[in-house]
Amino acid sequence: VIALGMSVATVYGQDEVTAINTGAANFLTIMPDARTAALAGAGVSLTGNENAIFLNGATIAADKNCRGGASYTYVPWMRDYQSGYSLHTLGGFYKIDEKNVILAGFRYYNYPKLGVLETGGESIRPKELAAEVGYARELIKNLSVSATFRYIYSDMGKVGNDRGASTVAFDLGAFYTKAIARMEGASWSAGLQVSNLGPKIKYPKSSESLPMMAKVGGSVDLPFSQMHRLMMTADLGYRLAPSDVQAVNVSAGAEYTLAEHFMFRGAYHYGDKEKGDHSFATVGAGMNRYGGHLDFAWLFASDDCPFRNTFWATLGYSF
């Protein structure tokens, strides 16, 4: 049982995709969808994403192109490290009117069977989940804000704990966008999000901090013609808690859109390896038609990175 507990601890903390051996519910830091993953997690200032509730809910209030949408994402996490880890994500939103938006999301993180207890012969299979609802509003022209409530449940499969534990957390977001003069359709945007503000998860024999994060980011959208469009974005993040992994990270990437229907993406994430935040590169592609879209992303990292060669697949629809 001790060995199995160590096995869980080894993978239990992944910050921004990442930190190791610290904190609880770190599946919340895994990039939630393929577009965001292809941009190395730089999503705090991007519009047009059904998964905005996980990134910055305020961005969706500023998006005038659709009334609602939903998507599903599958991530076989750490597939090179050990099979069986996976993240399933559902995200969506609905605009009540031109200024007010309701958002919803659900994430389920599955572990492989890690072994069998000596007593009772029960298999050990930890699992974690989060269910969340959010509200976003356009306060004034170009400026939006959001708030998200999140319920988190963590069950480490009786490894050192008699039962699962739960807690709640909140996110706060803000978003500003403005048109660029003398270039039709061009704009720049800035976003801010503070995520997972809440109490520790209290297990029967211990308590663990949530992966609290602050992010600020910016992007520029440049439609050169109806056939060619370029978007560039960057995020600066700071891990606020747990205290032993406080560190700065940076993500930057670009998205090229061809003929309005085909997207190609690439990005790089720089992190502090000593804090468990590995640096990595990502690439991805997507296509959309009649409101539906399909996106894919792939992560490249060094051989000592446990989540190298992870991929994301997202299927979504907006109207």
Regions found by a protein language model. Give the residues of each.
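Bacterial N-terminal signal peptides
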Residues: 1-7
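Sec/Tat signal peptide C-region and signal peptidase I cleavage site
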Residues: 8-13
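Subset of outer-membrane beta-barrel
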Residues: 14-319
